[in-house]
Amino acid sequence: MDSNSKYVYASKKRKYTCDDEEAEEHNDPHDKNIYIINNHLYFSSDITPKSAFTLCKYLRSLEIKLRVESISASSNVQPEIYLHITTNGGCIYSAFSIIDCFKSLSIPVNTIIDSNVSSAGTIISIHGHKRYICTNSYVLVHELRSGCWGKLAYIDDTYKNCLKIQAHINQIYLDKTKITKKYLKEILVKDLELNADECIRLGIADEIYISK
C-alpha cells in the first residue's frame, strides 16, 4: 500500500501521484474501464479519485435503474448489483469512498474478484453483501507504502497519519474476514498472493463465482 505526501495508497506494484495536473481529454478516460451489462458492473482500473468517482456515479445510476425496473414490474424480488473488480489497487482514500457509496445504496452490492484484486481493491471487495471470487483469481493483501519529503515535523506527522490509516485498514480486515491478528501481521509485510481456495478459507471471499 503506497502513499505520497498528499494521498495514501494501497497498490500492488506501483507508486502513484494523486495530483490532477496531467492534461486530459474531454471524455473521462476511466469510462472505458468501467461499464454496465444489465445488473453487472465491471470495474477494471487502478483505484484513483477519478475512477472511484466514476464507479460511484455508475453504482448510483444503476441503483436507480434497477429500482425503477423493479417497481414497474411490481416485483417482490430485491434487485442486486454485481460488481466485478479487477485492480492492482490504488488510493486508499478512494477505496474508502467506494465503501461508503456501497453503504449509501438501497440495494445490495455483491462483489466478484475477477482475475486479480490487490491492496486497496481488497478493501472494496470484502465489503460486498455477497463476496465471490473466480476460480483462477488471485488476491494480494499487504501493508501501506509511503513516501514524503519536507521538514522533520511534517515527516513525523505523515508517519503518524500512516500509522492511523494502517490501523484503520487492519481493523477492516479483522472485522470483515476470518484473518487473525497474528496471520494479518505476517501477510501484511509480504507480497504473497492468495488463490481462490485460500481466500475462501480466510473469509476474504464467500464462494466461487458462477455466472449469474
Regions found by a protein language model. Name each.
Residues M1-K212:
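Terminal-region recognition feature
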